[in-house]
Design a protein with these regions (language model features):
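Membrane-interface helix-boundary motifs at transmembrane edges
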Residues: 3-8, 63-76, 124-131, 187-191
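Terminal transmembrane helical module of multi-pass membrane proteins
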Residues: 127-194
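N-terminal membrane topogenic signal
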Residues: 1-17
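Hydrophobic cores of alpha-helical transmembrane segments in multi-pass inner/ER membrane proteins
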Residues: 51-63, 113-124, 169-185
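A glycine-rich, hydrophobic loop/mini-helix early in the fold
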Residues: 32-98
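Non-cytosolic membrane-interface motifs at loop->transmembrane helix junctions
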Residues: 38-45, 98-110, 157-166
């Protein structure tokens, strides 16, 4: 399998690490104005996508040295998939509502689509067990409460009137994410052991 050879190549891993590191930094900078008005207790839960890429960056750093970090791997897989898909859908929804999308919207579609894909591509290398996925699942679902009960969700001014529908969609996206993460990791391990 040629793609696995590429995914394991140290040079490729280093480039991917640097892309994710700079993407994480850019992502936190993108959230700067929202973080400035966020109560301290919620700060860790507001910058969803940069936090997801941060988890993946940490995974890549350890993976470069042939180490596994299952809790980080579970958080990376679930958050990359969920927030990657979420941002793509929200930007397409913005395009539908407004009839137009600026260059940043298209950049977010491409970069967040890539986030979701990279999390899935590395699934065969994760050492995730049920306890690791349970922690990541709690993180995802707890984040829904923070976002949609306490109003800390990312600010998309043009979509504000659809917050209830977006919250409902996001909850089910989390459930789908947990299912996909299980099937790609624990489910595959069960197949190999059978």
């Amino acid at each position: 399998m040629m793609y696995k050879y590429i995914l394991l190549d140290k040079r490729f891993l280093l480039v991917l690490f640097l892309i994710n590191l700079f993407g994480t930094i850019y992502g936190f900078m993108w959230y700067e104005s929202q973080l400035a008005i966020t109560p301290t207790i919620f700060l860790i839960f507001v910058p969803d996508s940069p936090t997801a890429s941060m988890f993946f960056t940490i995974f890549l750093l350890f993976f470069l040295f042939n180490k596994n970090t299952p809790y980080i791997e579970a958080l990376a897989l679930t958050t990359l998939f969920k927030y990657g898909i979420w941002a793509v859908v929200m930007n397409i929804f913005t395009l539908v509502v407004q009839g137009t999308l600026d260059w940043q919207g298209y950049m977010l579609i491409a970069s967040h689509g890539a986030m979701a894909i990279q999390g899935i591509l590395y699934a065969p290398f994760y050492k995730i067990k049920l306890r690791h996925l349970a922690v990541a699942s709690i993180w995802l679902l707890h984040n829904e409460i923070i976002d949609y009960v306490y109003g800390m969700m990312p600010i998309y001014h043009q979509l504000t009137k659809y917050m209830n529908e977006i919250g409902y969609f996001t909850f089910w996206l989390s459930i789908l994410t947990i299912f996909v993460a299980y099937k790609l990791t624990i489910g595959q391990q069960d197949k190999r052991e059978a």
